[in-house]
């Protein structure tokens, strides 16, 4: 008799990446860098590839310090992750109990659906109109004392739509009043140019995730990070694997 997985895991549907070679396709499905990196970047990276670099465990502390300096934050406010996806999963691991309500817009980044089901959350969705219009009031009215987590990709994928700074602030205040955590996924923020990063110092209910995969074109490196108040980041840190990222990611 086969060993049965947990019932909610058995219900999940996930596709395997079975294509042998995707390089000859226009890979618009994952928004990968199709033009490659400058030769100088590759040459600089090769200088890191020594025997010690490959055989020793990664030292993440220099990258933490560098990010803290660039973002104007303390290292205790930053959590490195395997892409922004890894940071998002850590949020669910640290904060979402079975039965908690998680609010997302729809359609949006696919992994929100996966993690909501994986951690047995009750998924709430605020849907777009046919013209890809989503009034912020539609999101606000779905936030309640039962809401544990609100996930907003800004800009949103796949719609490319954005919430303004004023709208994000309204969502944050409603989340605070309801005791919910507000996650803003800024994976595509470089294409929009506006960030909510400066709100981190104002709220203990806000998290922001970013990735090196999109605008920086480093999808294979699997490097991202989450930022928030030290208490929230400390809880994410408790969920990390032995090493948050690999040595190749630290080189960037």
State what each model feature region is.
Residues 2-83, 90:
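N-terminal small-domain helix-loop-helix segment of the aminotransferase-like
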Residues 78, 180, 205-206:
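Short, conserved active-site loop motifs that form the nucleotide-linked donor/cofactor pocket
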Residues 83-91, 182-188, 192-193:
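Glycine/small-residue-rich loop that forms an oxyanion/phosphate-binding "nest" at active or ligand-binding sites
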Residues 94-152:
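PLP-dependent aminotransferase-like
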Residues 119, 177-178, 203:
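Helix C-cap/helix->beta junction micro-motif
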Residues 130-190:
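Active-site phosphate-binding strand-loop segment of PLP-dependent enzymes
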Residues 205-252:
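PLP-dependent aminotransferase class I/II
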């Amino acid at each position: 008799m086969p060993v049965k997985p947990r019932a909610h895991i058995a219900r999940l549907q996930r596709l395997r990446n079975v294509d042998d070679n995707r390089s000859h396709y226009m890979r618009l499905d994952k928004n990968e860098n199709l033009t490659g990196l400058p030769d100088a970047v590759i040459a600089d990276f090769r200088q890191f590839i020594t025997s010690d670099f490959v055989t020793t465990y990664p030292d993440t502390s220099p990258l933490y310090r560098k990010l803290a300096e660039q973002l104007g934050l303390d290292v205790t406010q930053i959590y490195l992750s395997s892409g922004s996806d890894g940071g998002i999963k850590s949020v669910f691991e640290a904060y979402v109990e079975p039965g908690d309500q998680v609010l997302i817009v729809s359609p949006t980044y696919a992994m929100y659906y996966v993690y909501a089901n994986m951690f047995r959350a009750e998924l709430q969705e605020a849907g777009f109109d046919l013209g890809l219009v989503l009034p912020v009031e539609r999101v606000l009215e779905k936030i309640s004392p039962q809401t544990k987590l609100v996930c907003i990709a800004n800009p949103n994928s796949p719609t490319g739509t954005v919430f303004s700074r004023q709208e994000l602030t309204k969502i944050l205040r409603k989340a605070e009043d309801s005791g919910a955590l507000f996650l803003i996924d800024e994976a595509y923020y470089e294409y929009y140019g506006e960030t909510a990063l400066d709100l981190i110092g104002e709220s203990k209910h806000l998290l922001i995730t970013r990735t090196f995969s999109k605008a920086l074109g480093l999808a294979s490196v699997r490097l991202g990070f989450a930022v928030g108040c030290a208490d929230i980041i400390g809880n994410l840190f408790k969920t990390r694997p032995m090493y948050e990222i690999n040595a190749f990611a630290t080189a960037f």
